[in-house]
Amino acid sequence: YFFLIFLTAFSEINSKDIWYEKNLKDLEDISLELNVVGIKDDVWESRLYNFLELRILEHDIVILKNQIPKLVIDINIIDSRVEKTSSFFVGLSLYSYSISEKMYYKSIADTLITKKLMTSKFFSTEIMGQSSSNNLYRDVEKSINRLVSNFIDQWYQDNPLKQF
């Protein structure tokens, strides 16, 4: 009985860290991709992309074309003009190259650089919500702003000297 209590307490202490903690360390440049599904509004998409660029650039993170790591913002909208509520999903993910542990140790042993890189998710956060059709764009924009703020906050936690 005592062993179970000790094991539970020990596992809770060790599992409190966020899985993406320190994954944004030394991140200085990214590419940006915006995917909108459910609404075809090129002007709004362009406005969102410009907003995202400005939010990232104001923190001195350089945006390059066709670069890895890639910051992907996925927006899925179900706009119901018939029903009172519409639904949306906004996801922000950072993808970069990685290598499996087995291949890493093999490349060290062989002193060769491996070419078997994988694309992995290094950071991810998302929001699901509901809104009226009249407030849908505004609520999606608020959600995007909240996710970008979370990303920037984590970036500063992983790169504390960038604040100065």
Predicted regions, residues:
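Positively charged n-region of N-terminal signal peptides that target proteins for export
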Residues: 1-2
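A structural "domain/chain start" motif
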Residues: 5, 10-54, 153, 157-164
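Alpha-helical interaction segments
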Residues: 9, 95, 144-146
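C-terminal/domain-edge helix-coil "capping" segments
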Residues: 13-22, 105-164
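Amphipathic alpha-helical segments that form well-ordered structural scaffolds
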Residues: 51, 55-58, 147
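Surface-exposed short loop/turn segments
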Residues: 59, 67-138
